[in-house]
Amino acid sequence: MAFNFNWSPLMADASFYTRAQDLLTAALNKSPKPPIIVDDIIVTELNLGSIPPELEILEIGDLAEDRFRGIFKMSYSGDAFLTLKTRVQANPLNTYLLTRPSFATPLPLAAATPLTIPLQITLSDIKLSGFVILVFSKQKGITVVFRNDPLESLKVSSTFDSIPFVRDFLQKEIEAQLRILFMDELPAIIHRLSLRLWVPEYRAGEDFETQAEKAETANGEGPGQDPLASPPQDPVDALGHALDESDIASLSLDSSVEAHSLFSQKNLLRLAALTDSQRTLSLFTPSIREVVYRAWTSPTDQTDAAGSVTSPVLSRTHSQVGSMSSFQDSASIASMQTRSSTPSHTFSGYGLSLGAGRHSKAHSRKRKKRVVDLRRPKTTDDAPSVSDESAFTESTSAPSVCSAPLPILNEQSDDPVTPPLSPDNDLHLPIIPDRHRMSISRPAPRRDIAAEMMRDMGGPSSTSDPATQATQSEDTSATPRATMRAQIPSIYLNEKQDAGSSTGVPRQLPSAILPFLNDNPMNRVVDQALVERLAGEIARRMRDEKFMATNACGSFWDRHSQEESPPPAYGH
């Protein structure tokens, strides 16, 4: 299939070249330019030449009288040329400093002085080859799309052809810009030109937009507003001296006198005071409209800008670990009372702790452990703190079930009742807190007091038969009571002593337990009166403790004491 391609009308139309130059100039300045180019790129000359491009039809999709769509293979090697004009930065150090952050540059003075040189570039010997998709319509114009990069080579002639480095740099940069131009900008340029040629409505609208732009430019170039037309009432010069009307009349925008110093004396004083107050951190700041103050000028301003009545006063509240109640810091309450001196701060912090102390009395004490553990705990810091009244008889008195368990002998067996046959080498006695408080030098009679009470009350001694001891052990393990806990250390020691004497084999006890073994009969004779008094006191306090524990944990005691017989300690 053959067709005629007329290239001469495009060469003869002068308006086409003018419009094409404007579109090319806008396209070249649209993309980001390299930093070495410091001015706009202007297309000064455009010539398409006399040699048309060669087109080869590869495919025709649509063919009609007013429309056409096809794929062509285009190759061009003609005499078209393009001339550009711009300005470049000849000092490479200035370009380097402009493209780097200020804190990372050495900041030279004279070496970084800019030096701009006009540059004229001519593009010729353009060779193109590629596949083009062409769509033609009289209503929509011509659309040309390149499927690949059509630019093969071109020649760049510039003012710096004598410098090889600059010439190569310009060649590389211009080729990169032209590739972007052919792929992105050239199809849009061709489409707009075709609309201008074949669509009269588009041409009329474009002419109207051009006239509107010229009118706006003409209006913007007029003279500005004269600041001397309405001078202030009390004008002063740069030194602060007052000016009369004759001096003001002699001033003009073109005169050498500084017209910007024509300010009011009052405003100058206020500005000076404002500057001094900010420089010296003075509390005095003059009241100037539309000024944001960094500090309150007077109590009235603070009252006006204070918060509303509903704004609460913030105060710290502390939570107690292990309890459900929270209390308010006294320092916060005092500071809140001192801060609420202004009339606007009428909020009270009393309501912050209304619901905080609802369960404070019920949960103010430490949580009680209601499991009677006959084994020695791992740490000795869990020993309960006792009052001064029961500090003397804490080791032998029956503790409350609600209290934490007292530490007892360290046993290796899992059975909490049956003692080992032989004492271990690492045997430890229970920690007696009142020994550290009261500094009792003779703790041995306490063990004898428990033994005397066992004999007086008719309880089982260390020489009783094993059946009775087994019955007591089962009862203790079935129903743990505090009285049995208090008597267990004495029973263990007596059984160990009797077992050691029956076998006849001497067993050496640890040195830590020797002060608690009273084998000297003289001590018992001397302390017999003291033992009797202590036994009576212990029995009385045990009854009192039982009564107090019944009142504190009545439901717990009623659950056990109503069904079972009382322990031997409470038998008399």
From Swiss-Prot:
It is a multi-pass membrane protein. Signal peptide: none annotated. The keyword DNA damage does not apply. Keywords: Lipid transport, Lipid-binding, Membrane, Mitochondrion, Mitochondrion outer membrane, Transmembrane, Transmembrane beta strand, Transport. InterPro entries: Mdm34, SMP_LBD. One of its GO terms (cellular component) is ERMES complex. GO terms for biological process: mitochondrial genome maintenance; mitochondrion-endoplasmic reticulum membrane tethering; phospholipid transport. Residues 1-195 form the SMP-LTD domain. Residues 358-370 have a biased composition (Basic residues). Residues 210-239, 330-423, 455-482 are annotated as: Disordered. Residues 330-347, 387-400, 460-480 have a biased composition (Polar residues). CDD domains: SMP_Mdm34. It comes from the Eukaryota. Coiled coil: none annotated. It is found in: Mitochondrion outer membrane. Component of the ERMES/MDM complex, which serves as a molecular tether to connect the endoplasmic reticulum (ER) and mitochondria. Components of this complex are involved in the control of mitochondrial shape and protein biogenesis, and function in nonvesicular lipid trafficking between the ER and mitochondria. Mdm34 is required for the interaction of the ER-resident membrane protein mmm1 and the outer mitochondrial membrane-resident beta-barrel protein mdm10. This is Mitochondrial distribution and morphology protein 34. It comes from Aspergillus clavatus (strain ATCC 1007 / CBS 513.65 / DSM 816 / NCTC 3887 / NRRL 1 / QM 1276 / 107). The gene is mdm34.
